[in-house]
Every structure is written in structure tokens, then in C-alpha cells.
Amino acid sequence: MKKYISKFHYLTQDLPNRSHVEQTRIACEAGANWIQYRCLSKTDEELIAEIHELAAICDDWGATLILTKHFHLLDQVDAQGVHMEDMKADFKAIRNQIGADKTLGGSANTFEDIGRMDQAGLVDYIG
């Protein structure tokens, strides 16, 4: 299945003076059509509540919403996929869990990382 991967990604961050919701709204207003929610500081319950808010903003703007690392939440929220920053993640197990319809991306820091992910054929994009 061919998936659309935007060329303009915005990654939210845990910032002291700007919430993920504010960052998402500003990014969408600026033309971003791919939002990667990168929150590493909240409980699953807090994440789910915030993801619902982000999904509403993304839906309003026609933007794709990708979660960083929290693939276990995909069946509880309206997000289109997950991005794994752990180069050693079990991409086969993650792909099996999330299914073929969800987007799966992975971070790469070396050419070896890129080769391993590409050879496995399980990720939709490498960043």
C-alpha cells in the first residue's frame, strides 16, 4: 500500500511555555500537514486526552497525526501512525500490532540503521 508522506513535518516538543496543542495549532496555521506528537513526559491517560485535542486540530486542517513511540495507544486515538526513535525497536512486532494501514516511521542515525530498516521493508519512511 502506497502511503502519502508529507515533505513538511512538524515535531511537537515538551516546551515550558507552549503546549503541544498550541504548537500543533501554530504549525497547522503555518502550513504543516504532518504533525508528529513527541511527548515523553506524560502518563498514557494524559497522552490520550491530549491526542484527542491534537487529532481535532489536525482533522480541521487536513493534517496527518503521528505519535512518537506510543504505538500501544493507536487503537484508542485518531492518529494515522507512529514514529519510533529507538533504532533497535522490533519493527516487525510493531508492524504486526498496528497493521498495514497505519504509517510506521523510524529514526536513523547511521547508514547501517537506514540499511537495516530499509532491508526489513517494514517502515514507510526513515527520518
Task: Describe each region flagged by the PLM.
Residues M1-F91, Q97-F111, R116-D124:
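Conserved N-terminal beta1-alpha1 strand-loop-helix module at the mouth
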